[in-house]
Amino acid sequence: MTSPRVVIGAPLYNKAGHLPEALDSLLAQTYRDFALVLIDDGSTDATLAVAERAAAADPRVHVTRNERRLGMLGNTRRAFDLPTTMFPAAEYWALASDHDVWHPRWLETLVGLLDADPGIVLAYPLTRRIDEHGRPYANAKPPWRFDSRGCTDPRARMRLAFRRMAAGDMIYGLFRVSALAAVGTYRPVLVPDRLLLSELALRGTFAQADEVLWERRFRGLAELERQKQAFFLDGAPAYTHLPWWLQHAGAFAWAYAVRGEGASLGIGRRAGARLALDYLDVSLRHRLWRRARRLRGRAIRARDAALGPPVRAALAVPAVRTVVRRRVVPALGAAEETLGRLVAEAEREGAGDDR
């Protein structure tokens, strides 16, 4: 079996309605040297039949069905392990969903970025969010931008990636297999994509193509309780009741300070312990920034709501105006100034969005 340069792993589960469009867009890529491995996790709808029809029509498509359900975490891991085992000479790997849409030049563009610079370990495009019917959201935020090319210090890249990444978009980019294999894909924690990308940042840079080449059928953020159910079919481990960022810091400590997994990067166990502390530090700063931003927003909304007609009528009384001017306004101003300073300090550190 000739090995393609690119392998794509797609974990499938009960998305028969959107899967045909997803497969059509993947198989319409202008860059054609790839294999697509579809892994069904025991779907109860027509998902498997859709996948098998695609395999019958295109020799690049391969289909398998898990003997038992693995859940989202296990099936995503298998979506890396199986394609790279089937095609061990593959240089690049991508994770594909069973419900999104890819522009025909998506793969061509990302392969070009990785080919141009061996220091890049992940390439991804700008993302457009679409609804269940494929329509772009009218009130969607502008595409998230993050590119770490030019950042040469591994620890600085890790901190930068944590603050600025849009993990839910970037995880569907194109990875350099050698770098991803060294990290080991998803660890058994909640929000594993953020941890994976933080670890991967130690091994190289992230490059973003400056055009929208992927449409994400946005289904809302995955609540942590739902993640526990989808990831751990036999019951969530006790440590998943900890905040996800503490789980990540613990995983960093175990991997790099105890097991010495950073040896290939010249990161000893003592430096690995510092990495775990770095991760914990940037996590706490990020949470502080988000909390300060929320509090500032509430203060501004409360202030604006307070300027309604009843308050304006009260302010027509000179004595009320005097009290408000001397006592209320200075107190509100001091609170807003403090929150504004916290937000500004965090933004100078590069705090990002949790998309």
Could you say what each language-model-derived stretch is?
Residues 1-233:
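Nucleotide-sugar donor-binding/catalytic module of glycosyltransferases
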Residues 153, 157-169, 177-178, 184-355:
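C-terminal subregions of glycosyltransferases and related glycan-biosynthesis enzymes
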